[in-house]
Structures are given as structure tokens and as C-alpha cells.
Amino acid sequence: MAFGKSLFHAIGRVSLVRQIAAGLALGIVIGSVSPQLGLAAGLFGSLFVGALKAVAPVLVFILVAATIAQHQKGNKAHIRPIIVLYLIGTFSAALTAVIAGMVFPTHIVLAGAGDVSAAPPSGIVEVLKSLLMNLVANPINAIANANYIGILAWALVLGAALRNHGSDVTRQVVADLAEAVSTVVKWIIRFAPLGIFGLVSSTIAETGFGALAGYAKLLAVLLGCMAFIALVVNPAIVWWKIRRNPYPLVFTCLRESGVYAFFTRSSAANIPVNMALAKKLGLHEDTYSISIPLGATVNMGGAAITITVLAMAAAYTQGIQVDFATALLLSLVATVSACGASGVAGGSLLLIPLACSLFGISNDVAMQVVAVGFIIGVIQDSAETALNSSTDVLFTAAADLGRQRNRAE
């Protein structure tokens, strides 16, 4: 018993990042050496992601409602500058992907469209309609289905009603509930090393690395664009806001948010992680409690890259030459589509046919491109989610720190 306690204390003294690194390394070894054991270990990953996904909608609803209910008149949440950064970042990602697609034209071997079961949206109007319908969804269904647009809308309405008509005791109860749910999130995050060990070992056991070799160039363009956004474009945007070296903040967000998101492959599951990081960075709670769940829905730079690169690859594969004007239009369509990706089953991949329609590519061919996306999804989706989710907290921090700098001046 004493040995067990001392072991837990020793593990507790090791930083969470190092524990995650150890879990990652062990997962790679187990998944490679013993696929059967790796698949069995996948249960830990499923439990970890399931717990995060389960608590995230409740956390967002209660935290946003509590924040609005306790919001004092005269205090501003300063959400608008963050939304502007989200849109700039997403459009920059789409434009970067267009340029990369023209500089490194990629031809792909089309996979069978039968591998894709879901139906893509018929047009941009359907994407926007889906977003608006999510806004007025039943609040219980919104929480149950992790519909964050609906959750945000109802939390804002309930919080405003409590602020104007609730008693001090009622508002305090909601605040205590928010604190309790935040504590539960901290407990879940402590199991991240075990969860990531399970996710990595099962992924490698299931797919290995051979399935990705045939699409190496396509993956290189996708990952290159995402790395360029994460390490060049985003830091430039952050510098514009805070006017000092952005890289310490950028690397903190990538390390403490991007790593989790890469392995969970879920922006929703990463919301509690981003909330905890925002609190650690000392950001304004009235701001990040709204901007981070909103970012998980509309800040989709990684999705814009995926849509653009695969649509251009489809065009080149069909022998279609892409002129700059069409490419620029593709950037705009990809930006709007990416912002609606969370409202579409299948996310960014099923918005590819919408982008392909700009080039007159048939739906049959477009769905084969989507099937290719699912083949490389083990890497593409992980990198996309890491970029999307880490950028949520990065831009929130940049806007908040920029506001503090302006106030100091």
C-alpha cells in the first residue's frame, strides 16, 4: 500500500507533458510490436475521448451561462476582435493552400466512392441553413448531440435571463456548478497520458504506416500548409496584435492544446483542455468562456486547407488547369465552407464536393476524392484538429493580450 502511494506521488511529480510523451512513445512501441495488444489498449483511448466528449457540452453550457449571469454591466467580453482573427486565420489558411496547390500540383489515384456512406451538402446555402437550424435546436438535444452553436445560443439566452431576473443565490448556484464541472474536467485531463497511449497504440495497430505511403505527396502538401500556418502565418497575426515575440505563446498553445487535439481528433473534446490553458494563461474568463467554444465551431483553418488542397488535387487529376481568379474564389468558398464544417456530418471532407463544383467536377469523382481523404484521415484529421483547436486558444490569447497592451499605452 505504501509502495503504491509513493509510486503515485512519484508519477504526480512528473509534468503532464512528459507523461504524455511517455504514453506516446509506449503506444508507438506496443502498436508496432504487438498489434493485438495495441487494439486492446485502445479501450483506454476510447474511454478518455468519451469522457472528454461527454463533459465538454455540459462544461460549455454551464460555464457560458454562469459567465453571462455574473457579467457586470460595463464589462465587455471583447469577442468581436477574436472573431475577426478567426476569419483572417481561416482565409489565410485557404489562400496558403491555393498557392501551395498551384506551386506543387498533385495528382492522386482515386479511391472508390463506395467507401463513403454520408451525403455531402448540395451547396453553400445548405451549409448556412444547417448552421442556422443548429442555432435554434432544442437545448437538451443540443447538449446531447454536442451541437455547440445551439449550446452557445441557449447558454447566452439563459445567462442573460439569470443576470436580469435571477436572485443572487441562483446565480451563485450556477457559478458553483461551473466550478464543479471545471474540477471534473481537471480530473479527466489527469488521465491524458493513459488515454493517448491507448489512442496511439490502437491507431498504429489498425492502420500501420503502409496505407499512407501511396498518398505521400498529397499528405506532404497538406501537412506542409498546416505547418506553415502554425509556424509562420499565425505567429505573424499574433505579432500584429501583441507587438512582441509571438513564438513563446505559439509553442505553448501547440504543446498544451495541439498535442491533445492531435490524438483525440476532436475539437469538441479539446474544449476543456483549451479552457484550462486559457485560465493558466490568465486570460479574461468572460472572453474565453465564449470564444473557445465558438472557435471550435467556426475557426477552421485546418478544414479550409483540407478542402482547398483536395479540391485542387481533384482538378489537376481531371486535367483541369486552375487560373488565379478561380483559385481566389476557391479560397473564399473554402473559408465559408470551413466555418460551417462543424455543422456537417463528416466535417471538412464532405464539403470537398462543394469546392469541386467550382471546377465543374462531377459528384462521382468528388466523392472518390472524399474517399481518399478518409484513407489519409488518420494523419490529415489529426493535424487538422491540432491546428484548428490550438488556434482557438492562440487567437483568444492574442486578442486579450493585445487589448491589455492597448490599455497600457
From Swiss-Prot:
Question: Could you give one GO CC term from the UniProt record?
Answer: plasma membrane
- Keyword Transmembrane helix attributed: yes
GO BP: serine transport; threonine transport
The UniProt keyword set, sorted, is: Amino-acid transport, Cell inner membrane, Cell membrane, Membrane, Symport, Transmembrane, Transmembrane helix, Transport
One of the record's GO molecular function terms: neutral L-amino acid:sodium symporter activity
> InterPro entries under this entry?
Na-dicarboxylate_symporter (IPR001991), Na:dicarbo_symporter_sf (IPR036458), Ser_Thr_transp_SstT (IPR023025)
How does this protein lie in the membrane? Answer: Multi-pass membrane protein
Instruction: Offer one Pfam family short name for this entry.
Output: SDF
Record flagged with keyword Endoplasmic reticulum: no
| Location, primary (coarse class) | membrane
Instruction: Report the catalytic activity.
Output: L-serine(in) + Na(+)(in) = L-serine(out) + Na(+)(out); L-threonine(in) + Na(+)(in) = L-threonine(out) + Na(+)(out)
Where's it found, cell-wise? Cell inner membrane
Using the record for this protein, list the coiled-coil segments as residue ranges, or answer none. none
Residue stretches spanning the membrane: 24-44, 48-68, 82-102, 142-162, 194-214, 218-238, 292-312, 319-339, 365-385
Please give the function described in this protein's UniProt entry: Involved in the import of serine and threonine into the cell, with the concomitant import of sodium (symport system).
Among NCBIfam families, the record links this protein to:
PRK13628.1
Annotated family:
Belongs to the dicarboxylate/amino acid:cation symporter (DAACS) (TC 2.A.23) family.
Q: What is this protein called?
A: Serine/threonine transporter SstT
- Species: Neisseria meningitidis serogroup C / serotype 2a (strain ATCC 700532 / DSM 15464 / FAM18)
Corresponding gene? sstT
